[in-house]
Amino acid sequence: MISFIGYYNYTVILTYISLFCSIAGMLFTVNGWYKMAVLCLALSGLCDMFDGKIARRKTDRTDDEKCFGIQIDSLCDMVCFGAFPILLAYSLGMRGPIGIVILAWYGMNGVVRLGYFNVCETKRQEETEEVRKYYSGLPITSIAVVLPLVFVLHTVLRNHFAVALHVAMFVVGTLFVTNIQVKKPRN
């Protein structure tokens, strides 16, 4: 019988569904089906909103399962809310030198934000069982709300859509690593 590495239980299922949605969204993006891609990004964000809450309901998780959950969540977040939005924004018009620099800035800050979160969350879970109340910096998942809103506005913005997209990606990427406290939404 074949066995697989990793942990496969209900605590990570929404994380994997989120990843599936984002991979589908990337494929929609490269085929020019932007409405479907944006929908996939929003669905991925919705899954990510609840994955931690579901994981915390399993009270008998081992330390390895908890650590795996932190790591797999961040790895999936980098694909879902890092790489996927970069591909989508590039395809929607951020193709010049300024756009490419902004997208690289966004991606770099996404990685830094997730790495910092992993270190802090691992330490926090060793010290307390309490649910986190605040994030340091804007969570990377926020792009699943911001980018669809900017996309919906493209019919209104028309000639200014590219500017709005550039500004949104730069501001959101910067807020990932800005030392601000962001209240965690209650699910």
Regions found by a protein language model. Give the residues of each.
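Membrane-water interface of alpha-helical transmembrane segments
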Residues: 1, 5-15, 31, 35, ...
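Transmembrane alpha-helical segments that form the membrane-embedded catalytic/substrate-channel core
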Residues: 48, 107-120, 170-185
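Topogenic membrane-insertion module of multi-pass membrane proteins
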Residues: 1-52, 175-187
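Multi-pass membrane catalytic core of lipid/isoprenoid biosynthesis enzymes
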Residues: 11-16, 57-114
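Helix-coil boundary and interhelical linker segments in multi-pass alpha-helical membrane proteins
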Residues: 24-39, 79, 83-104, 149-165
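Lipid-exposed faces of alpha-helical membrane segments in multi-pass integral membrane proteins
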Residues: 14-20, 40-43, 79-82, 101-108, ...
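Cytosolic, membrane-interface loops and tails of multi-pass inner-membrane proteins
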Residues: 1, 50-67, 117-133
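C-terminal membrane-associated helical module and adjoining short loops/tails
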Residues: 2, 125-187
